[in-house]
């Protein structure tokens, strides 16, 4: 009986330690900037709020800037972070800047309780492209959009 209780206590203690050590997503950001588009956009999602900002960088004034700021709920945040595969995101390889060819650079930043991960233009091969664009779709849906560039 003592042996069983000891094993149970040890298993619970180990489970508690491993859960405490898990990396938790605290914030997700997406930015696009530069190039011929002459505007930049920035999305931020965390457990408190969801924000979007688009602003014109140069040129004739247009209907920009646009700003959206919405409160977030713990339930929504939990569902959002469950959709993100942090391990796959960590494996993405940064791509070269696209501004030299008048393109926009795109950056995704994921902040956790342990570290900040930043990836730029990380869609250079089929595997990376799938992970990258799936994450962009997850972010877009948080704002009721079909795609991040809508």
Where are these regions (language model features)?
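N-terminal export/targeting and maturation segments
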Residues: 21-56
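Short, well-ordered, aromatic-rich surface patches in folded extracellular/luminal domains
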Residues: 22-35, 81-83, 90-150
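Acidic/histidine-rich, surface-exposed loop or edge segments in extracytoplasmic proteins
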Residues: 52-68, 119
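Short, surface-exposed coil-to-beta transition loops
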Residues: 37-42, 65, 102-105
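Mature extracytoplasmic domains of secretory-pathway proteins
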Residues: 67-93
């Amino acid at each position: 009986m003592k042996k069983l209780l000891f094993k149970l206590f040890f298993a619970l203690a180990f489970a508690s330690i491993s859960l405490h050590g898990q990396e938790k997503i605290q914030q997700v950001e997406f930015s696009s900037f530069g190039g011929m588009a002459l505007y930049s956009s920035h999305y931020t999602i965390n457990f408190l709020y969801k924000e979007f900002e688009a602003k014109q960088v140069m040129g004739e004034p247009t209907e920009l800037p646009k700003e959206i700021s919405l409160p977030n709920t713990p339930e929504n945040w939990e569902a959002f972070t469950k959709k993100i595969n942090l391990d796959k995101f960590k494996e993405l390889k940064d791509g070269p800047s696209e501004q030299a060819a008048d393109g926009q650079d795109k950056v995704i930043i994921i902040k956790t309780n342990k570290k900040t991960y930043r990836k730029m233009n990380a869609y250079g091969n089929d595997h990376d492209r799938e992970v990258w664009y799936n994450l962009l779709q997850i972010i877009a849906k948080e704002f009721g959009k079909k795609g991040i560039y809508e």
